[in-house]
Amino acid sequence: MAVYAVTGGAGFLGRYIVKLLISADDVQEIRVIDIVEDPQPITSKVKVINYIQCDINDFDKVREALDGVNLIIHTAALVDVFGKYTDNEIMKVNYYGTQTILAACVDLGIKYLIYTSSMEAIGPNKHGNPFIGHEHTLYDISPGHVYAKSKRMAEQLVMKANNSVIMNGAKLYTCCLRPTGIYGEGDKLTKVFYEQCKQHGNIMYRTVDDDAVHSRVYVGNVAWMHVLAAKYIQYPGSAIKGNAYFCYDYSPSCSYDMFNLLLMKPLGIEQGSRIPRWMLKMYACKNDMKRILFRKPSILNNYTLKISNTTFEVRTNNAELDFNYSPIFDVDVAFERTRKWLEESE
């Protein structure tokens, strides 16, 4: 029976991974490692769940928290393209924090690491080039924001660490998973958009081109892909060792506006008029100045305006081929759970 650790386990995705691990037959103990205290810690009658408050940049504390662990699912990250954190803060957690986790793997002889990367490790790029493809599609990877850069660098670090020698001459095996736009209960950004619509009289004003298609994926299916990858990476000859996979399900691929309307229309939200692009650019520039001068974050800035209007559509079944992944939550269930959460959080 194994001991798993989930860094960022008190977060949006991490909590769902912990919930699913409770049903994993081969897991005896789950260590939930996060810099913040979980206000609603998950409990179980069949698994030992230990919560450890820890900064992943503190090697000594990380080493202590991971001593005796067999496998790490590393989700801890600062996900920010709005200006809440400085560039240095984002790099410190996302890149250097991953370095710390890898160093602990080597020092403690932990043989398996599943890393939560991001679609932004690939794109959309700073040029606004559309992406339609799979893990092996050629694309100009040129990050336009420090968050994307940090996830790209951390993913490369984890991929390079695969098959490296650790304590007692054993080998470290790694795998990276790249979620596209995650939604589901607990998604703060979806909640912000819903609240804005309510403030505007149940109207969603459109800010994104209809042909800017983005792949989306439900948080429960992303979590399930992590749990499956953690199982399969331990098999001799597993194809996932040293590989990266996009996270996907059968959620509709469409523009951000259209997706939000599909999700929220049963909650009384109606489509509004389109805000002119020149006006959006003007507000984005103003918000960028506020971020620079006053450290005031904003959902609308020049970076988010560009990437939301740039197609990023994933078409792949590689996770199914290599580790037998298929979604365990269909779209109707995913939407219903998300809607229920939005209603209850009003």
UniProtKB/Swiss-Prot annotation:
**Chain sites annotated for binding NAD(+):** 151
Respond yes or no to whether keyword Mitochondrion is given for this record: no
Q: What is its EC number?
A: 1.1.1.145, 5.3.3.1
Q: Which residues form the active site?
A: 147 (proton acceptor)
Q: What induces it?
A: Expressed in the early phase of the viral replicative cycle.
Which GO terms fall under biological process for this protein? steroid biosynthetic process
Described function? Catalyzes the oxidative conversion of Delta(5)-ene-3-beta-hydroxy steroid, and the oxidative conversion of ketosteroids. The 3-beta-HSD enzymatic system plays a crucial role in the biosynthesis of all classes of hormonal steroids. During viral infection, steroid production contributes to virulence by inhibiting the host inflammatory response.
Q: Which PANTHER family match?
A: BIFUNCTIONAL POLYMYXIN RESISTANCE PROTEIN ARNA, SHORT CHAIN DEHYDROGENASE_REDUCTASE FAMILY 42E, MEMBER 2
Q: Which family does it belong to?
A: Belongs to the 3-beta-HSD family.
The protein's name? 3 beta-hydroxysteroid dehydrogenase/Delta 5-->4-isomerase
What organism is the protein native to?
Monkeypox virus
Q: What gene name is given for the protein in this entry?
A: OPG174
